[in-house]
């Protein structure tokens, strides 16, 4: 049996054994459970050479032949990069959760939910058939509901989880209608075949209907204005969930969908007007709300809303350089945002608060956490020598030199939004650690190894990917941009 087929089920198998493993080994069970996503990461790495040379991999099995429903997968630069982010960062999140949830009576259940969430997101980005894609899309909503509402005895957690489920679940039904329209217009129900049917779809009188329905699904999942409200409220979830949700998983599912469909649905007036309009608005709204917060997680959550808006804006802008900037920024954001959320979790876990007005002077007590924070903030701010610098240089260039009528406005919005994100990033990285020591609810000390591995490795990855930019471009950003554009770059 194909190993890739089995890879779809590995996270769910790990989820089944997570409770007994955590009961038997305690928090150290995280090391054993992390082997599952680590194996998947290595498996997907095996596709890098072929994908880097412009190859695409498809495969699968017939499921319901009478309805042309297959269990099929499609691996190209876009899906492979997402799969590597999901499993690579997922490995670190499992380790982090082991330390963060140490001693919690339900840590086994929590690990099980995290692994199911990972499996749902991995399946979503690798699915070729529309049916498989929709099943995994809705499964991400269900598993995120379980994670956001993990503290089910708290009214606020239950309300936030329900809100996220209603918004994203309803968006999924809207998306299903859009996929059915696309299927009826083009006669294909697999993404790998749809990419060659773009002219048929764009010329159809049903294009606008499909476009609006697809956007309904994508905008709910990726928290675009005015549907952004559920994402900050999801911060009621434990920090490992927040870090994973914002760096590599569900909130980028909508962006993934738009990037996947760009070759087939892009290059129209509707696409190149609506996406920059809503994306740019979301970018500005997110950053303005971020600078008004004092809670570390809320500050980072609103900058995620802003970053998702930036990615949608660039995806809709339509030029090759803008797309290249978008894919560079997507990867960079996954690295620095995952690290910063784990930093916020370390501070909250060890000091007892994440209110920046009640924090200060932690540098001598948490030097490793501070190191990860400052490197990640430098990347978030778009400063050298981090990969965030490469991403922001590329995206500014991609919109500023364009002859598109929106170019000047989009450039101004991108600069304004990123300037505010720069401020937020350094407030998160500096305020808790510098200045005079502030009395905190708990006697602060450095986080345990399980909680340091994630932020340190992601911060180092932000540096290494910039230093080794030729390899980074060859194996990651270039194949991904080619998949989004629909031709080699």
What are these regions (language model features)?
Residues 445-489:
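Hard-cation-handling environments
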Residues 57-67, 190-198, 394-398, 471-489:
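Membrane-interfacial helical/loop segments at transmembrane boundaries in membrane proteins
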Residues 7-8, 15-16, 33, 222, ...:
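Hydrophobic alpha-helical transmembrane segments of integral membrane proteins
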Residues 34-48, 168-179, 373-381, 454-471:
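Hydrophobic alpha-helical membrane-insertion segments
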Residues 92-133, 142-447, 467:
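Hydrophobic transmembrane alpha-helices and their helix-loop junctions in integral membrane proteins
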Residues 2-10, 39-42, 49, 405-408, ...:
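Membrane-embedded helix-loop-helix hairpins and adjacent transmembrane boundary segments
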Residues 138:
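Short phosphate-coordinating micro-motif centered on Lys-Gly-acidic
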Residues 1-5, 15-112, 184-202, 229, ...:
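Transmembrane helix-loop-helix hairpins at membrane boundaries of multipass inner-membrane proteins
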């Amino acid at each position: 049996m194909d190993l890739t087929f089995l890879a779809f089920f590995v996270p769910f198998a790990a989820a089944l054994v997570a409770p007994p493993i955590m009961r038997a080994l305690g928090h150290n069970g995280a090391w054993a459970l992390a082997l599952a996503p680590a194996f998947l990461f290595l498996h997907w790495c095996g596709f890098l050479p072929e994908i880097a040379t412009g190859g695409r991999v498809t495969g699968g099995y017939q499921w319901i032949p009478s309805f042309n429903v297959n269990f099929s997968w499609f691996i190209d630069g876009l899906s492979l990069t997402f799969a590597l982010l999901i499993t690579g960062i997922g490995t670190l999140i499992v380790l982090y959760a082991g330390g963060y949830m140490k001693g919690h009576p339900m840590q086994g259940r929590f690990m099980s939910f995290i692994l199911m969430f990972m499996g749902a997101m991995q399946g979503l980005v690798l699915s070729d058939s529309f049916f498989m894609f929709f099943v995994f899309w809705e499964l991400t909503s269900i598993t995120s509901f379980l994670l956001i509402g993990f503290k089910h005895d708290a009214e606020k957690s239950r309300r936030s989880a329900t809100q996220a489920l209603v918004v994203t679940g309803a968006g999924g039904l809207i998306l299903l209608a859009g996929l059915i329209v696309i299927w009826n217009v083009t006669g294909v129900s697999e993404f790998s075949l749809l990419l060659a049917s773009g002219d048929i779809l764009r010329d159809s009188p049903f294009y606008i209907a499909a476009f609006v329905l697809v956007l309904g699904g994508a905008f709910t999942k990726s928290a675009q204005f005015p549907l952004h409200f559920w994402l900050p409220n999801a911060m009621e979830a434990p920090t490992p969930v927040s870090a994973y949700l914002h760096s590599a998983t569900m909130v980028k599912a909508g962006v993934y969908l738009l990037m996947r469909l760009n070759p087939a649905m892009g290059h129209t007036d509707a696409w190149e007007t609506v996406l920059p309009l809503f994306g740019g608005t979301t970018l500005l709204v997110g950053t303005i709300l971020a600078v008004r917060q004092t809670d570390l997680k809320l500050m980072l959550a609103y900058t995620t809303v802003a970053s998702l808006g930036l990615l949608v804006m660039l995806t809709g802008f339509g030029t090759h350089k803008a797309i290249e900037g978008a894919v560079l920024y997507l990867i960079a954001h996954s690295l620095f945002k995952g690290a910063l959320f784990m930093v916020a979790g370390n501070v909250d876990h060890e000091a007892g608060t994440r209110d920046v007005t009640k924090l200060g002077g932690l540098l001598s007590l948490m030097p490793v956490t501070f190191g990860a924070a400052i490197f990640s903030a430098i990347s978030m701010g778009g400063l050298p020598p981090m990969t965030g610098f490469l991403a922001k240089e590329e995206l500014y260039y991609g919109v500023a030199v364009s002859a598109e009528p929106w170019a000047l406005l989009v450039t101004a919005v991108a600069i304004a939004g990123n300037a505010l994100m720069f401020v937020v990033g350094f407030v998160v990285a500096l305020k808790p650690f510098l200045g005079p020591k502030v009395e905190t609810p708990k006697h602060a000390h450095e986080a345990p190894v399980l909680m340091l591995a994630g932020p340190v490795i992601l911060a180092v990855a932000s540096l290494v990917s910039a230093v080794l930019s030729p390899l980074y471009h060859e194996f990651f950003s270039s194949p991904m941009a080619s998949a989004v554009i629909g031709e080699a770059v």
